[in-house]
Amino acid sequence: MSNLNILIVEGNIKKDSEIFIKATGASVSDNLKNLLLKLEPSVAIEVVHPGKDIEVKSVLSRINTFNGVIFTGGAMRVNDQTDEIKKHINFASECFNYNKKILAICWGLQVCSLAAGGIVSPGKNGAHLGIASNVKINETGKKHPMYKDKLFLFNTPAFNFD
């Protein structure tokens, strides 16, 4: 996969990233970047923080150079609608305008859903904290290197408010 250029959108504000770094040794975007580089060492990866206007302006001026965009998970709640959250949603809208291929994970999916005109509602019973059971990898997924030597049916932690 030579010449693959991916943009990762960090889903956390600085304060939340610092907590994540303290716990894991890297930000959410850096963890994802490290995983992608392990799977495909030749991929070019850039990280953008939607709350940093200078970064956003620079990235949008070169958005057509990216093969795809990955929106990470994060600790914010989209329905809080802070200025920072609005910047994330606006950035997703800009990516849509350029017809970029997008992978949105957790928080990123909520941001992209709102940017596309959807609705994200708070959980009716509060936070969901538990285990997603019997997650099954489909035939295409079974061929992906990420699932090499892994079970194709598994349980995983699940946590979200919205």
Task: Give the label of every model feature segment.
Residues 54-57, 119-121, 141-145:
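A short, acidic/glycine-rich surface segment
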Residues 75-140:
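Cysteine-nucleophile active-site neighborhood
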Residues 48-51, 123, 159:
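Conserved beta-strand termini and adjacent loop/short-helix elements that scaffold enzyme active sites
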